[in-house]
């Protein structure tokens, strides 16, 4: 029999009060604080993302693992600790039990954040971009655990599509195969992170948050349903031309192969190359995408929690 203290949830008082009153709450990952941006930009962005959720009327809940405890919502001091502590583990669904057992610190990805959000009773999650099938994934089988986790939780994911470095066509095919409902907000194109279009059409378009909220309600009532992925493109003024990004990515892939860069290092290599090719615009766009998706997630959660 499982002991209750095996999963020590520490829920921030603001988040706890919101959940108890059935108010809208949006979960956020902590991986962007530890692995996405440098200090102090990581703290500034984390606080800006939380502020964006609050602007919508919802309550933010940044999730992370701290000394073996599951934090659901963080104080400023905890965000600072995540931002400045070196060597914090990147935690996905597969290594989450080990990080908890070792009572260490861990920054949650999309997959683990969804698992812990559901554990806490949170129904919405915001991320800049989901993981997916990597380029060459048909041979390497390098597929993000995000896609599998969508089938195991029913927490709605609001994002700006999938990350640019992925094989987005195969990612969409994989989501369809796994019965994951995908909808785009006010666009026919499936977005790609800080690019407003990935070059692939959306499986489904809806133009109002009310319509999306109704679809979420129905999806959650269906037996065996997966999480719904809601993709909202970044604002035009924050977007980067997809042609520039794709050219930089292709050049980086060829350069990585020539230098013998393999495994998880390839992603870091490509992202750094894109940042250099865009003269730092990609890093700024990354932060803007995070803020925009967080605000839309908050708005959607507020609409969902309205009496209908």
Curated annotation (Swiss-Prot):
Bound cofactor: record note: Binds 1 Mn(2+) ion per subunit.
Alphabetical list of InterPro entries matching this protein: Indigdn_synthA-like, PsuG
Binding residue positions for substrate: 90, 110, 144-146
Cofactors: Mn(2+)
Catalysed transformations (reactions): D-ribose 5-phosphate + uracil = psi-UMP + H2O
Binding residue positions for Mn(2+): 142
Gene3D superfamilies: Indigoidine synthase domain (3.40.1790.10)
Keyword Lyase: yes
One cellular component term from this protein's GO annotations in UniProt: cytoplasm
Keywords (A to Z) from UniProt: Glycosidase, Hydrolase, Lyase, Manganese, Metal-binding
GO BP terms in the entry: nucleobase catabolic process
Pfam families membership: Indigoidine_A
Statement: the UniProt record of this protein carries the keyword Manganese: yes
Documented EC number(s): 4.2.1.70
Protein family according to the UniProt entry: Belongs to the pseudouridine-5'-phosphate glycosidase family.
Subunit structure: Homotrimer.
Known function: Catalyzes the reversible cleavage of pseudouridine 5'-phosphate (PsiMP) to ribose 5-phosphate and uracil. Functions biologically in the cleavage direction, as part of a pseudouridine degradation pathway.
PANTHER family: CARBOHYDRATE KINASE PFKB DOMAIN-CONTAINING PROTEIN, ZGC:136858
Record-given protein name: Pseudouridine-5'-phosphate glycosidase
Natural source organism: Serratia proteamaculans (strain 568)
Species lineage: Bacteria, Pseudomonadati, Pseudomonadota, Gammaproteobacteria, Enterobacterales
Gene it is expressed from: psuG
């Amino acid at each position: 029999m499982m002991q209750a203290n095996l999963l020590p949830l520490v829920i921030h008082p603001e988040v706890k009060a919101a959940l108890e009153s059935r108010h809208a709450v949006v979960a956020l990952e902590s991986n962007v604080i530890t692995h996405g941006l440098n200090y102090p930009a990581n703290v500034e962005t984390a606080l800006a993302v939380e502020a964006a959720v609050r602007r919508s009327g919802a309550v933010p809940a940044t999730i992370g693992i701290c000394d073996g405890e599951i934090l659901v919502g963080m104080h400023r001091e905890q965000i600072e600790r995540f931002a400045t502590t070196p060597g914090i583990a990147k935690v996905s669904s597969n290594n989450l039990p080990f990080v908890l057992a070792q009572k260490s610190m861990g920054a949650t990805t999309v997959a683990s954040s969804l698992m812990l959000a559901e554990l806490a009773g949170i129904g919405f999650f915001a991320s800049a971009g989901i993981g997916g099938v990597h380029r060459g994934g048909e041979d390497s089988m390098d597929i993000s655990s995000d896609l599998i986790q969508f089938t195991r939780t029913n927490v709605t994911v609001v994002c700006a599509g999938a990350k640019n470095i992925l094989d987005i066509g195969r990612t969409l095919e994989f989501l369809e195969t796994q019965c994951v409902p995908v909808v785009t907000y006010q666009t026919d194109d499936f977005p790609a992170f800080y690019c407003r279009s990935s070059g692939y059409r959306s499986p489904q378009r809806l133009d109002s948050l009310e319509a999306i909220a109704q679809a979420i309600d129905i999806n959650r009532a269906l037996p065996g349903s997966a999480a719904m992925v809601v993709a909202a493109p970044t604002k035009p003024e924050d977007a980067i031309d997809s042609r520039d990004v794709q050219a930089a990515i292709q050049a980086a892939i060829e350069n990585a192969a020539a230098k013998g860069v393999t495994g998880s290092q390839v992603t870091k290599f490509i992202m750094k190359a894109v940042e250099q090719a865009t003269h730092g615009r990609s890093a700024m766009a990354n932060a803007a995408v995070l803020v925009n998706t967080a605000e839309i997630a908050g708005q959607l959660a507020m609409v969902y929690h309205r009496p209908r």
